From Swiss-Prot:
CDD domains: RF3 (cd04169), RF3_II (cd03689), RF3_III (cd16259). One of its GO terms (cellular component) is cytosol. Keywords: Cytoplasm, GTP-binding, Nucleotide-binding, Protein biosynthesis. Increases the formation of ribosomal termination complexes and stimulates activities of RF-1 and RF-2. It binds guanine nucleotides and has strong preference for UGA stop codons. It may interact directly with the ribosome. The stimulation of RF-1 and RF-2 is significantly reduced by GTP and GDP, but not by GMP. Residues 9-277 form the tr-type G domain. HAMAP family: Rel_fac_3. The gene is prfC. Gene3D superfamilies: P-loop containing nucleotide triphosphate hydrolases, Peptide chain release factor 3, domain III. It comes from the Bacteria. It is found in: Cytoplasm. The lineage of its organism: Bacteria, Pseudomonadati, Pseudomonadota, Gammaproteobacteria, Pseudomonadales. GTP binds at residues 18-25, 86-90, 140-143. This is Peptide chain release factor 3. Its main location: cytoplasm. Belongs to the TRAFAC class translation factor GTPase superfamily. Classic translation factor GTPase family. PrfC subfamily.
Amino acid sequence: MTNQAAEVAKRRTFAIISHPDAGKTTITEKLLLMGKAIAVAGTVKSRKSDRHATSDWMEMEKQRGISITTSVMQFPYREHMINLLDTPGHEDFSEDTYRTLTAVDSALMVLDGGKGVEPRTIALMDVCRLRDTPIVSFINKLDRDIRDPIELLDEIEAVLKIKAAPITWPIGCYRDFKGVYHLAGDYIIVYTPGHGHERTEAKIIEKLDSDEARAHLGDEYDRFLEQLELVQGACHEFDQDEFINGQLTPVFFGTALGNFGVDHVLDAVVDWAPRPLARVAHERTVEPVEEKFTGFVFKIQANMDPKHRDRIAFMRICSGKYEKGMKMRHVRTGKDLRIGDALTFFSSEREQLEEAYAGDIIGLHNHGTIQIGDTFTEGEALGFTGIPHFAPELFRRVRLKDPLKSKQLRQGLQQLAEEGATQVFFPERSNDIILGAVGVLQFDVVASRLKEEYKVECAYEPITVWSARWISCDDKKKLEDFQVKAMENLAIDGGGHLTYLAPTRVNLSLMEERWPDVKFRATREHH
């Protein structure tokens, strides 16, 4: 095995998906603790509660603007190199969150044991399904009251349409939480509260049919055996092929706050999740062990601090090796660039990078020339597929405070749309400009950046648009008929694509029924 192949085999690149407040931030801290990247799990010990005291580096990042370090974290674990990509929480949820999932090879789904499957999780799982991403599941908050675990598994299967295979099974919950039983291994991992800050070796009780296990479970023993019989009769067994194809998820139970069960999940990522996978380009399929460097940009992050105009373009390496100072071809522009200052995001620091391999995420300084979906190579003309625009879920009409600045407004919005900060639609029937976003914060970011960078002040007005769909049709005549009939709701997006702005869900259903030859797409590839 070449050194490059060995490096690729070590990589695991995954993202965490969850609904806000399911414990994603806590599990991220504990995963970093597993990799010893944060000495005290990102949390400064305060006497009573760890909840509000985050570490200095997070505070510093907040003052500097949107945190970059928390977007990508790289840390070693069990002789592997883990690349963990964060998907932002509630306030800063945006299309970036969806696109981040196009840059990973697997995902960790975190569910709140008291609430089960929630709306944001469903939306993120839909994106994972576009590429059949393998999913590991962690049911969190066992140190609180949770719903019946069997009910939770049923809900995963019914709502997320994926088979659920429990790997561990909880013994009690809340004050009675005693640990988990490993179904295939026939051993109990004992929960000892109060080790949220440190890595401790959990006590193991071999065999459920043992005096030690009976003593540990006490009065619960017989009831647990009954429940286990039910679980083993009704649940799926883990199957590696089904997992890799995104059809089955292994399920673990634990409490991230109590630092229990997180290592089981990370072990699953190392043992079962795929190493960096081949990526499909329009021209051919690119294998990660190829010698020549290739990569694509899936996210551009602007620094909110006006003093730092730098934007970081996040690139997933698909093949070859990045070396400091190497020459790369920016395929869309045809320009060759020498990249001497790419960033890595090791643990909690932004550092200049010496080398990186397939599966790694690197940051390029971007002065407005790089767009989402751009490919970089050592000269080959390649364009990777599967980096989509997603149909926005929220819409606003833009109103200019100074009508003389409409040119600057259009220019600014065009730039921000290319960067992925928002989507812009120009209705066929009016001079309105409509913005689309996935999270409310995107609108605030756009307004503040228009003001700072383009000296344009704007306000937003509500508008009756439920969703957007990109339109295509193989029959030119039918497409023309459709355009005449649907003119009222048609727009052109920032990339020049025909889009249908549906005022209601019912309207969209009716249109899809009436025009069976017209494709109404909820995603559109970046070109």
